[in-house]
Amino acid sequence: MKIRPIGDRILIKFKEREEVTKSGIVLPDTVKEKPQIAEVIEVGPGGIVDGEKVEMVVKKGDKVIVSKYAGTEIKIDGEEYTIIRQDDVLAIIED
Amino acid sequence: MKIRPIGDRILIKFKEREEVTKSGIVLPDTVKEKPQIAEVIEVGPGGIVDGEKVEMVVKKGDKVIVSKYAGTEIKIDGEEYTIIRQDDVLAIIED
Amino acid sequence: MKIRPIGDRILIKFKEREEVTKSGIVLPDTVKEKPQIAEVIEVGPGGIVDGEKVEMVVKKGDKVIVSKYAGTEIKIDGEEYTIIRQDDVLAIIED
Amino acid sequence: MKIRPIGDRILIKFKEREEVTKSGIVLPDTVKEKPQIAEVIEVGPGGIVDGEKVEMVVKKGDKVIVSKYAGTEIKIDGEEYTIIRQDDVLAIIED
Amino acid sequence: MKIRPIGDRILIKFKEREEVTKSGIVLPDTVKEKPQIAEVIEVGPGGIVDGEKVEMVVKKGDKVIVSKYAGTEIKIDGEEYTIIRQDDVLAIIED
Amino acid sequence: MKIRPIGDRILIKFKEREEVTKSGIVLPDTVKEKPQIAEVIEVGPGGIVDGEKVEMVVKKGDKVIVSKYAGTEIKIDGEEYTIIRQDDVLAIIED
Amino acid sequence: MKIRPIGDRILIKFKEREEVTKSGIVLPDTVKEKPQIAEVIEVGPGGIVDGEKVEMVVKKGDKVIVSKYAGTEIKIDGEEYTIIRQDDVLAIIED
């Protein structure tokens, strides 16, 4: 089974707090309850979104910082995922 | 009798919770009361919507994840359906 | 006497609840007080509306599902009508 | 003395309730206090309004149904008039 | 000393209530406290305003009906003036 | 040290009330607490702002009337300045 | 490890209050709790943002005045950073 995001949407999986800490990035106290770092699992094709051409710059496997609590959560085969728009991605983390 | 959605609208039928669980996708507790997975029954022609060209990417028979509680519910011959805009579709589920 | 809607507006007449039920479509309880199915009586010419070209896709005589309680009601020769924008039409019902 | 509306604005004069009733159109109770049918007295030239080209479709002398309580009232030589935008006109009444 | 309005702005001087009455136009009671008729003193050059080309249609010396209480008041050499956008002008009064 | 405003922003210095009065312009009582007349100290390059081409019409040294209390205040070497957008300038005062 | 901002976003580091004061710029009391002067650490590529072409004018190492409390804070290797959009930068400080 595969989730194919539509338009500029991407499917991400938030990283556990321990993993985040290990990678050297710690999120401030105010966001302690929900990690803001995620791995990109699937990427939509982009194209015309709201009448504007959107080019996808994130790729499968990227580690990203996500801006907001927004997004729709789904559970697939027991794992939690979130679908967000690419514009909710603030930055890509390169190792 | 047939429902022909206008513009970028689509007619969907939400899947029963049991069917959703069987397919390996479970929705989080917060949305327990209303399943977010639906089957596409009819698709509008797209075209110019709000002055922007909208191309339809969902097709009849697609299984889709729907973003919001929005949409207009109607009952046809005893069955419940919902009319939403294509932009309310987050992703297509492929088996 | 004739009502000629301007731009993308259409003149509709809501169908009585009994007629709606007979046609096999029943609206959910939450909208019991006002039927959402209407017949199209007159259609505006479309053209440039809010700076965007609008093409009319509904026709005189169409049976339509209407999205909202919006619209302006008027009474002509004792009959109640409503003027809405075409974008308030969700779908056309074909027999 | 003459009032020359600017852009897509028009000068209208609301019809007395008696005149409205005589013409076969009765407005619902909720708008009893202010008639919604008016005669067009002067029409602006249209042109670029809010960056969009607006073509005037109402003409001097048209009887029109007006959508809202909006508009600016003025009294000229003892008579009450209202200035509205053309987009506040819902339909033209033809005899 | 001269005030040069920027873009689509104009400098106006509201007319005293007595002058307004003399000219045959009386404003309704609800606006009794502030006359809505003004003389145009200076006119901005128009040009690109908010990304849209605005052509100035009011001229120095025009008598205008102004739509709103908006605008910024200033006092120059003891006289009160107001700066508004051209779009706040509803109509030009011709004698 | 120099402040270089970005885009359509300008750095201004509000004039003391005494200077304003001397120049023949008095602001109404409602704005007594903060003078609305300012001198332009630095001007941004304009260019594409919010996707629209903005041409700068105010110049260093201009005396301007400013529309709002908005803007960001900063203190440089003990002097107070404000950064506003050019669109917050209503008019230029010429002597 | 490197943070690569997306689109028109930039990664900044706010300067300590002491550094700000030393440089001759003092922020007013109302913003005492959070300095508004920052150093630019990383700059996104710009490109199409919200359907508009954005050209980046700030560069790595620039000292900038930032307009708002907005932005997302992250901690990298024990240091606090903030991700903002370029439009939140009011001006560049040149020494």
Swiss-Prot record, chains A, B, C, D, E, F, G:
Listed CDD domains: cpn10 (cd00320)
An MF annotation (GO) of this entry: protein-folding chaperone binding
Signal peptide (residue range): none
PROSITE patterns: CHAPERONINS_CPN10
Coiled coil: none
HAMAP family, alphabetized: CH10 (MF_00580)
Biological role: Together with the chaperonin GroEL, plays an essential role in assisting protein folding. The GroEL-GroES system forms a nano-cage that allows encapsulation of the non-native substrate proteins and provides a physical environment optimized to promote and accelerate protein folding. GroES binds to the apical surface of the GroEL ring, thereby capping the opening of the GroEL channel.
Quaternary context: Heptamer of 7 subunits arranged in a ring. Interacts with the chaperonin GroEL.
Record-stated family: Belongs to the GroES chaperonin family.
Official protein name in the record: Co-chaperonin GroES
Species: Caldicellulosiruptor saccharolyticus (strain ATCC 43494 / DSM 8903 / Tp8T 6331)
Record lineage: Bacteria, Bacillati, Bacillota, Bacillota incertae sedis, Caldicellulosiruptorales
